[in-house]
């Protein structure tokens, strides 16, 4: 018994020694990791590097960021201020909040900073995209792509977008069970991007398969750039390869078939615009361009669409006020008689309260956290040096949350954007859901158009209710969305705002 007791004590002592050694090793390695990045400060500048933590060697604070969500930024902002350092997705990073700080970064493009997304995003989106280009190449690409989002182009997309949304809402209402709004919003925006924006005639089964692959692609755009079996980065690369093959097939089929078209889609405009600027696009450039267009139209718009539905659920008075505006303009048409082309751009621009609702959704629930830049030369920000070679991420969502121009920032209040209040009129960098400067989101007008049409159709044709006891919490990666997707039951409404019976709904669906 004595020897057995001694053996147990010895084993426990060995285990304790191992734990102490591991703890010390982690502490020492973490301290060396901090010193390694502290040594990169620009010694010619007397200002200190921003405060913050670089986390653990190699992985930095990526784990904390993924687990804490919005709490990651807010907790560190409270501890370190509006400018702090961290290490995310395999790179050192300085995160920046506040209108004046963000303004300096956005207006310093090409002089102080240059765009550089995390390595995973650069590789997966491809080298020929607008997002990954810089300097003159970026300027030229924006000129080519800008025609896709012109007023004339948006007017031509509008009837098709409205029809896709009408069909989708009718399908949602015909479901006997609640739907996962975020997942279905992704399907909707993917269908809109592929069928309407790009004009691809992909069979329904192939479209469904392509959607599943695209989900895998989007989920891993922001991942640790470690190319190992079963890693998110590897899954993203595999998804990109499958998508590129599918897109090439669709592009070739589309280029060979020019009959029966009643409008110019984005791919037509892109090809024509590139020719006008003296450069015919290669197949690889077309594949990267279409992949970027789908990415831009898909993930962020699905996020904003889900947020719109959730806020209309939470605030029935807002939905009723929206219906009153539509009724006054003769646009509360009901779902009993679906038709294409009842909306025009001038009609939508005249709906002031609708515009306020969309603006407030984008303020409070901005789909993306911010934008990435690489520092070209050391500069000062909020009393700190931002060293050359470091990466900077300006935070859109946190700038909205801390903007002094907005009253009760956590309250969903569309009227803050009304003409009577115009809380956003003082300083354009307090409100920037689509970024700013020379890299303002090219597709912002298409995104707002889609959200407005969705809101009009929701108010006109649907009654919807939350299928769970409470609203879900929100996560931020890869874009803002509810953790459970938001479970909602939809019911169709007729032209008198009366609920359509299930058998009538089935008959309507069968005729479409």
From Swiss-Prot:
Q: Where does heme bind?
A: 441
Q: Which domain of life is it from?
A: Eukaryota
Question: Its membrane topology, per UniProt?
Answer: Peripheral membrane protein
What are the subcellular locations of this protein?
A: Endoplasmic reticulum membrane; Microsome membrane
Keyword Endoplasmic reticulum in annotation: yes
Q: What is its main location?
A: endoplasmic reticulum
Q: Which cofactor does it need?
A: heme
Entry keyword set: Endoplasmic reticulum, Heme, Iron, Lipid metabolism, Membrane, Metal-binding, Microsome, Monooxygenase, Oxidoreductase
Q: Name one GO cellular component term.
A: cytoplasm
* Gene Ontology biological-process annotations: bone morphogenesis; cell fate determination; cellular response to retinoic acid; central nervous system development; cornification; embryonic limb morphogenesis; establishment of skin barrier; establishment of T cell polarity
Q: What reaction does this enzyme carry out catalytically?
A: all-trans-retinoate + reduced [NADPH--hemoprotein reductase] + O2 = all-trans-4-hydroxyretinoate + oxidized [NADPH--hemoprotein reductase] + H2O + H(+); all-trans-retinoate + reduced [NADPH--hemoprotein reductase] + O2 = all-trans-18-hydroxyretinoate + oxidized [NADPH--hemoprotein reductase] + H2O + H(+)
What EC number(s) does its UniProt record assign? Answer: 1.14.13.-
Q: Which InterPro entries match?
A: Cyt_P450, Cyt_P450_CS, Cyt_P450_E_grp-IV, Cyt_P450_sf
**A single GO molecular function term of this UniProt record:** heme binding
Q: Name one Pfam family in it.
A: p450
Q: What does this protein do?
A: A cytochrome P450 monooxygenase involved in the metabolism of retinoates (RAs), the active metabolites of vitamin A, and critical signaling molecules in animals. RAs exist as at least four different isomers: all-trans-RA (atRA), 9-cis-RA, 13-cis-RA, and 9,13-dicis-RA, where atRA is considered to be the biologically active isomer, although 9-cis-RA and 13-cis-RA also have activity. Also has a significant activity in oxidation of tazarotenic acid and may therefore metabolize that xenobiotic in vivo.
Give the family this protein belongs to, as stated in its UniProt record.
Belongs to the cytochrome P450 family.
* UniProt name for this protein: Cytochrome P450 26B1
Q: Which organism is it from?
A: Rattus norvegicus
